[in-house]
């Protein structure tokens, strides 16, 4: 084992943890005043239940053994056998450290979905949904992409830090949930305004901070690959931020803090699948392209399909990053 790698991964896990409170501020600032408490409480609840589920069954179903390439096994239920020695996924850090890092991914992913149903889903219903979604969607998906013998990994799927496992699954699930629940009352009659702009910016800043642990930590060691992922993360977020602001200037005549915050977040999402694989110039292109795609694409899709995705969560998935990794990815190790 390597003490430096272990300290690095635990620090990155703490960074990723910060993302869920950051998301609570980001979403809480965007919703109407009457929905702020409920929206933020949803993220707080997920912070608690995701840890308990991960220790009891989540880690085992995601990374413990393999059944038909779809789901893990039962050998690590209750963290039984998950100790201080390295596991099968990283040679230089304890299995516990790897499990802790992955636990934070299992926390932020269901929290992302709450943006699609803000102001429409009762808290009790959300509790049941998050528990079932984690069991039926997230754990199997994590195993298929990242687990030993996972079906998607075996056919060549590459996801450096969760663009597919985290962002596409949460984005698609949020879209389906928004369609199922229907529109908010008065959705067609009124215009919804951001409730608290400073909350939105604070949330975006915390997300950017935490995303360094999200992407750099996925190298699972304090090495050059982690440094590369750190920089591509910075570049993509910055490019998307500037790109979104330019779009606002040309289309609306002014820039907004909410727009800049949204731009940087989708830039972070876009680079996630290939943060450790794409060259720096591709990270710039990824950031520059994702803003116009989301800015105009969401308006078109929501207009055509009449979707009430409360916080436009469907726009922030990892599709562009997955494409960038496919066509621009290189072996940097």
PLM features: residue spans?
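Hydrophobic alpha-helical transmembrane bundles of multi-pass membrane proteins
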Residues: 1-316
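Extended ligand-binding regions for polar small-molecule ligands
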Residues: 307-331
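Residue-level detector of short coil/turn "hinge" positions at structural boundaries
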Residues: 38, 331-332
